[in-house]
Amino acid sequence: MTYVSLADLERAARDVLPGEIFDFLAGGSGTEASLVANRTALERVFVIPRMLRDLTDVTTEIDIFGRRAALPMAVAPVAYQRLFHPEGELAVARAARDAGVPYTICTLSSVSLEEIAAVGGRPWFQLYWLRDEKRSLDLVRRAEDAGCEAIVFTVDVPWMGRRLRDMRNGFALPEWVTAANFDAGTAAHRRTQGVSAVADHTAREFAPATWESVEAVRAHTDLPVVLKGILAVEDARRAVDAGAGGIVVSNHGGRQLDGAVPGIEMLGEIVAAVSGGCEVLVDGGIRSGGDVLKATALGASAVLVGRPVMWALAAAGQDGVRQLLELLAEEVRDAMGLAGCESVGAARRLNTKLGVV
């Protein structure tokens, strides 16, 4: 089947996934106000295109963390991808490799980080801070040894947000899906009505990260450390002072603090505040190449895309993810050209205006 929009892939995923697994992917925390706001915020951003530009050689490539990428985009970390397709993370990594796009291996991946990184391409590793600091730093070492190019340190999960869909469903992992990077025990598989077994188990495994945790990670690796989950300008400035190679402006896809400001709302302020001191990425609600253009016009180095990649994985495995990335590449190039931009650098010089949705 050919998909012409990301919405097509969402519908296809909904058709094939069990309801509780689709809810695990789609849901946010609490009333899902931040989840909805992520889309609303993007829809309010309008780009002011430039005309009469030379568009004979439009390129969507960027340099990020010292290497070339085909798009101003990376695959976001998503846990337990074998929930959505038997090949899970391996299918996503292969498609991202072939598309020239970085992909982020999650601490809670359902295939080991070494197996995923062996696919090649541009793997990054996402780190959750565990109660045992030694285990956290061991994951960093393993990621570096496996060839990962950056450590994406998620800092907005002292514990999981209240994800009511999962609680109502009594969501638990099926026996054939595990956290492959460490012995996670069996708690996440124990189904209890009114309780998310995944959230309950995460609360036992995770610890709140602090600036001291950031320093410990930086001291343990030569890789760029990217802090994911930054929303306050003050935290962005401190991240630069702490030596972060990048930040991801993010409210965790609306899955942590319900009511947290959308990342796209804070992006311009944060880009101005860090003043080139580190790479600034953004995520939350990216659903088209036009959204990627909006983010770059607001100053983003790149965007992270999560849920749509999982829709594609569920719909058609590696081929689905390939189609998604090809579709986004086509949409990004099209949007850039229509805005009068021959490069991502030119897109970052576009002006924007907030409208009413």
From Swiss-Prot:
**Functional pathway:** Antibiotic biosynthesis; vancomycin biosynthesis
Keyword entries, A-Z = Antibiotic biosynthesis, Flavoprotein, FMN, Oxidoreductase
Where's the FMN hydroxy acid dehydrogenase domain?
1-357
Q: Which reaction does it catalyse?
A: (S)-4-hydroxymandelate + O2 = 4-hydroxyphenylglyoxylate + H2O2
Intrachain disulfide bonds: none
EC number of this enzyme: 1.1.3.46
Q: What's this protein's family per the entry?
A: Belongs to the FMN-dependent alpha-hydroxy acid dehydrogenase family.
Q: In its UniProt entry, what is this protein called?
A: 4-hydroxymandelate oxidase
- Source species: Amycolatopsis orientalis (Nocardia orientalis)
Q: Which gene encodes it?
A: hmo
